[in-house]
C-alpha cells in the first residue's frame, strides 16, 4: 500500500498468549511461534521501540539497543501483554489525521512534534505545531497515499497517523483509527469543535481540510497543572481554543498532573 512513496518501519506484533503457549499448555514441547518471533526480531535494525498495545501517546514506550535486550525482556515477567517491536526511525517527527467517511475524506497537512534526546515524542511534555507548509517535504504525495488507504479500508470519523521524515523519505510509524491526542489540535486548525468532525462526516461539509487555505495555524503545549482561577483566566484569551487538565497514570510511576493548551491563529 505504501511502497510507491511512503515507507513503513520494520516491526512485528507479538501475541502474548501464543508467545507463552508452552508455559500454559504442557502439550506444547516446541513453541514455533516464539522461534518465529525471535527470527523476525533478528532481521530488524536496532535500536528498536518496544511497547504494549494498550497504551496511548507513547506512554510506556521503551527503547532497546540490542537483540539480547529484547530477548531478555520478552522472556521476563515484564512481558504481560501483546507487544509491538518496531525499528526506531530517527528523523523529524510528524503526525496527521484523516477526517470523514467514504467518499468525503480530508487528509490534513502535517503537524510537527517535538522530540526527546532519544528521538521519540514525550506525551507529557511534547509540543505540536501545524500545519507545516514547506513544499520541500512533498507531503501532497503522502496525502494521496493516505487518501487511497482510507478509501480502501473505509475508515469513518478520525484516523491518526504518526510519521517520520528522514533523508527525503517519509515513513509510516503508526496508524490509530480513533480520536487521538492530536484531535483537538487538528480541530483547532480546522476552526471547528472536535465533535463537529463526526457530525460533518455524516452530514457533509463544503470545506476540504486537505487544503492549507482552509486551515489556521495551531499550537499544542503542556505545562504544570493550574488552579481553577488560572484556567478561567487562560481560557479568556481569544486565541485559546481548548484547555484540558489531565491526570495520567503510568505503570511504575506516580500520577502525573498537567495542563494541555491548544491555541490557534
What role is predicted for each listed range?
Residues 5-90, 102, 129-148:
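Active-site nucleotide/adenylate-binding loops and adjacent lid/helix of ATP-dependent enzymes
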Residues 155-167:
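A short glycine-rich, hydrophobically flanked beta-strand micro-motif that places a catalytic Asp/Glu
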Residues 172-174:
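Pre-DFG segment of protein kinase catalytic domains
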Residues 87-154, 176-202, 220:
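ATP-dependent carboxylate/phosphate-activation module, predominantly the ATP-grasp catalytic core
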Residues 103-104, 165-169:
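A glycine-centered beta-loop-beta connector
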Residues 1:
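N-terminal glycine-rich "phosphate-gripper" loop used for MgATP/nucleotide binding
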Residues 63, 98-100, 163-165:
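Conserved hydrophobic "DFG−1" position in protein kinase catalytic cores
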Residues 37-40, 199-265:
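Peripheral (often C-terminal) accessory segments that flank ATP-dependent C-N-forming ligase machineries
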Amino acid at each position: 500500500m505504501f511502497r510507491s512513496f511512503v515507507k513503513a518501519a520494520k516491526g512485528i506484533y507479538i501475541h502474548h498468549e501464543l508467545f507463552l503457549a508452552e508455559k500454559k499448555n504442557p502439550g506444547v514441547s516446541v513453541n514455533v511461534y516464539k522461534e518465529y518471533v525471535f527470527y523476525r526480531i533478528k532481521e530488524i535494525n536496532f535500536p528498536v521501540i518496544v511497547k504494549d498495545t494498550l497504551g496511548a501517546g507513547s506512554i510506556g514506550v521503551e527503547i532497546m539497543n540490542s537483540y539480547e535486550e529484547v530477548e531478555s525482556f520478552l522472556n521476563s515477567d515484564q512481558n504481560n501483554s501483546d507487544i509491538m517491536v518496531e525499528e526506531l526511525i530517527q528523523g523529524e517527527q510528524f503526525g496527521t489525521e484523516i477526517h470523514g467517511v467514504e467518499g468525503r475524506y480530508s487528509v490534513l497537512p502535517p503537524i510537527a512534534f517535538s522530540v526527546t534526546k532519544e528521538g521519540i515524542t514525550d506525551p507529557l511534555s511534547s509540543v505540536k505545531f501545524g500545519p507545516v507548509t514547506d513544499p520541500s517535504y512533498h507531503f501532497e504525495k503522502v496525502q494521496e497515499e493516505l487518501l487511497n488507504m482510507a478509501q480502501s479500508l473505509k475508515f469513518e470519523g478520525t484516523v491518526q497517523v504518526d510519521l517520520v521524515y528522514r533523508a527525503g523519505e517519509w515513513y509510516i510509524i503508526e496508524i490509530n483509527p480513533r480520536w487521538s491526542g492530536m484531535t483537538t489540535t487538528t480541530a483547532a486548525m480546522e476552526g471547528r469543535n472536535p465533535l463537529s468532525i463526526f457530525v460533518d462526516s455524516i452530514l457533509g461539509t463544503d470545506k476540504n481540510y486537505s487544503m492549507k487555505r482552509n486551515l489556521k495555524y495551531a499550537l499544542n503545549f503542556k505545562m504544570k497543572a493550574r488552579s481553577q482561577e488560572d484556567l478561567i483566566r487562560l481560557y479568556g484569551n481569544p486565541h485559546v481554543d481548548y484547555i484540558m487538565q489531565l491526570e495520567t497514570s503510568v505503570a511504575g510511576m506516580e500520577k502525573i498532573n498537567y495542563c494541555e493548551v491548544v491555541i490557534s491563529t
